Regions:
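Non-catalytic, C-terminal membrane-associated alpha-helical segments of glycosyltransferases
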Residues: 226-234, 244-299
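Short beta-strand-to-loop acidic/aromatic patch adjacent to the donor-nucleotide binding site
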Residues: 79-88
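Conserved donor nucleotide-binding strand/loop of the catalytic core
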Residues: 45, 49-65, 69, 73
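Short, acidic, metal-binding catalytic loop of nucleotide-sugar glycosyltransferases
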Residues: 21-30
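Conserved donor NDP-sugar-binding/catalytic core segment of glycosyltransferases
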Residues: 94-135
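A conserved acidic beta->alpha catalytic loop
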Residues: 22, 35-46, 89
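A short, conserved alpha-helix in the catalytic core of glycosyltransferases
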Residues: 163-171, 175-180, 185-211
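Active-site donor/metal-binding and catalytic loop motifs
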Residues: 204-225
Length: 299
């Protein structure tokens, strides 16, 4: 299998360098490495040129536009699979060997688990407990599996039927041929969830516990007004596109989004997001419930 490792980046030269070094250290080396550069201005292009790394530059089309271009290049250059990852994480040396050894014709995708680099038994993005339909459970306890030992109690053959794309996801060409490319209109947030559910239509999407991808803790990062907007809008779109009990999920989405925004920016900022003249949250909710995707707020 001819595998392309593809990274999407924007102004994270140091972290991107670390990720590229981790690709060089893979036991099973990728057959090509591509960086989609979303208009970086921090010397990324020069760094990649000095390493001789294949770079495709484009305007900042967000994560969704980056993944769309990476998959298009995979198809155009005749690769059998693409290994997709963001620029701020880095794979364990065994990761691609595990994934490429575990992929079968029956699977739509197999992905790494994403672990905190400062606490490598804890997930950056906790796994949901799943209901009988395979959706994240609303009423289970615990609803989230936050550590590797917790997930191990729920797995079969070291795999779990859910994945947090795109942090070490191996996607075969046959899956792309069947479902198409990532939808670039999502811009940021939700593109990976949309692709996950589209892939599940053609086969299982699994995370493999022995394929590890290390990543910074995202809970300490700023949550800007723009990020809140796209999180709310796109998650509401997805609730109605794929999920059971969408109204309950909508309420949870809005509550969780505003709580996270308040924790990082203060409760006054959260109240203004709902009640101020700009009312970014209200606009996001209205457009999300109308099913609108697209780049329609901020940068």
């Amino acid at each position: 299998m001819k595998i392309l490792a593809a990274i999407v980046t924007h102004n994270r030269r140091a972290l991107l360098t670390r990720c590229l070094d981790a690709l060089d250290a893979q036991v099973r080396r990728p057959d090509g490495v591509l960086v989609i550069d979303n208009a970086s201005t921090d010397g990324t292009a020069e760094m990649l040129a000095s390493r001789g790394t294949w770079r495709v530059g484009q305007s900042n089309l967000g994560s969704a536009g980056g993944w769309h271009r990476a998959i298009a290049e995979t198809l155009a250059h005749g690769f059998d699979a693409v290994w997709l990852m963001d620029d701020d994480g880095h794979p364990d040396p065994q990761a691609l060997a595990v994934l490429s050894g575990a992929i079968t014709p029956a699977l739509a995708c197999i992905s790494s688990v994403v672990l905190r680099e400062d606490a490598p038994d804890r997930f950056v993005f906790p796994f949901p407990a799943l209901d009988t339909d395979g959706h994240p459970a609303l009423l289970a306890w615990p609803r989230k599996l936050a550590t590797l030992p917790e997930l191990e109690t729920r797995t079969r053959d070291r795999t779990y039927p859910f994945a947090h794309l795109f942090n070490g996801a191996l996607v075969p060409r046959r899956t792309i041929d069947a479902i198409g490319n990532v939808e670039p209109a999502f811009f940021m947030f939700g593109d990976e969830v949309d692709y996950f559910y589209r892939m599940r239509r053609v086969g299982p999407v699994l995370s493999h516990l022995d394929a590890r991808h290390y990543h910074p803790d995202v809970t300490v990062r700023p949550l800007t007004e723009t990020k809140l907007y796209y999180y709310l809008k796109n998650t509401l779109v997805l609730n109605h596109r794929y999920m059971n009990r969408p109204a309950m999920r909508d309420a949870a989405t809005v509550g969780v989004g505003l709580y996270r925004y308040a924790r990082r920016n203060g409760w006054r900022a959260a109240v203004e997001a709902v009640g101020s003249p700009s009312a970014v949250a209200r606009r996001a909710i209205s457009r999300g419930l109308a099913g609108q995707v697209g780049r329609d707020h901020g940068g």
